Regions:
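An amphipathic alpha-helix signature
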Residues: 27-34, 54, 58, 62
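Conserved GNAT-fold acetyl-CoA-binding loop/helix
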Residues: 41-61
Length: 181
């Protein structure tokens, strides 16, 4: 996977995906990250620590691990979520509660998908808890195809969630009208 995917902002109308190295330039990002990460839906469907503290935010605001390309969603100058492309071409994303229901995550997935394909990534995946209807809907609407269950469920905070995989193969992408910007 190319290592400089997140070198430049990606823009779609009012949505900017800001490279993570620039995330601290967003006013109030630390407080917004703490608030978003303590949201019940975020706690339920992600592996963020709970309760999520300023110390957790400071650690997360550092540069991502090697091989991970990460962007912050920014709308009207405010942090509204983040998306990352992990090794193996796996996308992960979340949206702050104040920004949900506006199609931002779908647009972010489309932008990162297009960028990854342009940079030579041949296969992309999204792994989602089976019960996370909102994230599954994003994967489907972004043109990813349901590909079954992952071998191991996710275990966190007393929940055991089966994980489903959505896949986009580059050879499919040009034929799919539902992944166009």
């Amino acid at each position: 996977m190319p290592t400089d995917l997140d070198g430049h902002p990606l823009v779609d109308g009012d949505l900017t995906l800001l490279p993570w190295r620039d995330v601290t330039s967003i006013p109030g990002v630390r407080d917004d990250l703490v608030a978003a990460s303590n949201d019940p839906e975020m706690v339920r469907w992600t592996t963020v620590p709970h309760p999520y503290t300023e110390a957790h935010a400071d650690e997360f605001l550092d540069v991502p691990a090697p091989g991970v390309a990460r962007w912050a969603y920014v709308v009207d100058g405010r942090y509204t979520g983040n998306i990352e492309l992990r090794p193996g071409g796996v996308l992960g994303y979340n949206t702050a509660p104040w920004a949900r229901g506006r199609g931002l995550t779908l647009r972010a997935v489309r932008l990162v998908t297009q960028r990854a394909i342009a940079d030579g990534v041949r296969r992309l995946e999204i792994h989602v808890a089976e019960g996370n209807v909102a994230s599954r809907s994003v994967a489907h609407k972004a043109g990813y195809t349901y590909d079954g269950f992952l071998p191991e469920p996710a275990r966190q905070r007393g929940y055991v969630d089966e994980l489903v995989r959505y896949v986009l193969l580059v050879e499919e992408a040009p034929k799919r009208t539902d992944i166009a910007p």
